Amino acid sequence: MADWLIGIIMGAVEGLTEFLPVSSTGHMILTGHLLGFDDERAKVFEVVIQLGSILAVVVIFWKRLWSLVGIGKVTDGPSLNLLHIIIGMIPAGVLGVLFHSAIKEVLFGPGPVVISLVAGGILMIVAEKFSKPSTARTLDEITYKQAFTIGMFQCLALWPGFSRSGSTISGGLLARVSHTAAAEYTFILAVPMMVAASGLDLIKSWDILSAADIPLFATGFITAFVVAMLAIVSFLKLLSRVKLTPFAYYRFILAAVFYFFIM
């Protein structure tokens, strides 16, 4: 298959699934397997196109991100600030730094991904069933305690297949944060976390890159960016109506497909 077509397909899958609670890792592994694109170059490619998805968040939430560093203000009252983001980053950041190699060796495989797809789906159903009325209906009403709780649930996203958004939105619901506020906080929190993780992986894999890969990587990056923009906007509109449960059942189906086609 032509590199440009692989770039479009993989970029579209990455952009569509990165911020939905369905596990981008599971979809990327499955798609790469079906396309025969799963060597070391493919792993570096996935890191690069993930940056395209991150850029989509930056573009959509640019006013909010500027306000976090003191440039501009989105509301006259109390609002989300940089400390909320730092608090949310600490749990997964510490765990990721301490156990980065072990996580890569133990959890990056078909078996662990199938388990996490199912476990993540169960978590989402449990969160929907046992969540109480929201005390933080908007992003600016999230407390530091709620930010830390969401950050703790983000640790689950270190396990490929759990889904960052699925884990953190579930944590937000259990901490009495609304679906939309939890999702928006999740997307903003993902920017520094994903930039750091992707940057580290890219530095470690730099020697694999070559000039011949630029067209493939550029195609994937641009596709991931455009599709992620559409996916984020659509998901935020959809989430207030359909909740997490349909995504949980989709994860169970994906786990079955993964089991029969990959394992």
Curated annotation (Swiss-Prot):
Q: Where is the signal peptide?
A: none
Presence of keyword Transmembrane: yes
Record-linked Pfam families: BacA
EC number per UniProt? 3.6.1.27
For this UniProt record, the keywords arranged alphabetically read as follows:
Antibiotic resistance, Cell membrane, Cell shape, Cell wall biogenesis/degradation, Hydrolase, Membrane, Peptidoglycan synthesis, Transmembrane, Transmembrane helix
- Provide the primary localization: membrane
Role played? Catalyzes the dephosphorylation of undecaprenyl diphosphate (UPP). Confers resistance to bacitracin.
* Protein's recorded name: Undecaprenyl-diphosphatase 2
Specify the species: Bacillus cereus (strain ATCC 10987 / NRS 248)
